[in-house]
């Protein structure tokens, strides 16, 4: 099929995306960019660690703040980049990690979302960049600034899986040392591909076995306010191990 000619609206959107990409990169460099130090010991199995749960959140009371001692030092920060095609479930993944219930329907991210999650030893900053075609061009600019990449894939979207594979391998090639967690999302759907099929179709079996690439299942679907999906807890546990 011959490529369609670009109309004025498409050109305008492309220019806006270019500006947005530049702004995103500046924001990232200003607030999160600090380079990356390797922390993952390949001799330690992440699945053997103590069971982890999603972060718990308490109501903030201004009266409590007056009685608290000032912090002696700030917690170190760890950066996680969350990418994937539009509609894969990146925003829902961030909501679930932050203790919020998933939203009904699909609301695309026009720009980025960010979440900061506290742990005992450090704070985890997760940045999601939208998965529209115009924004994918800028993904590679961010991978060298983070500690871990999370790549979310819609397990039921067979039609666009080749595009997901292409974008994933671009990122893998950009930084051979970056740990990558591939989230096989929407495994609860009847049409979802199996983990074995996804591993083949995403070309993960061809990756050097010395590379830190993990494929984990998730079923991040709308549910009640007490929703806590086991797959997401498993992913959070792995992230803590990779970031420690």
Swiss-Prot record:
MF term (GO), any: GTPase activity
Pfam families per the UniProt record, alphabetical: Arf
Keywords: GTP-binding, Nucleotide-binding
One GO cellular component term noted in the UniProt record for this chain: mitochondrion
Binding-site list for GTP: 84-91, 128-132, 185-188
InterPro entries (UniProt xref): ARL10 (IPR042951), P-loop_NTPase (IPR027417), Small_GTPase_ARF/SAR (IPR006689)
Coiled-coil segments: none
Family affiliation: Belongs to the small GTPase superfamily. Arf family.
Protein name: ADP-ribosylation factor-like protein 10
Organism encoding this protein: Homo sapiens (Human)
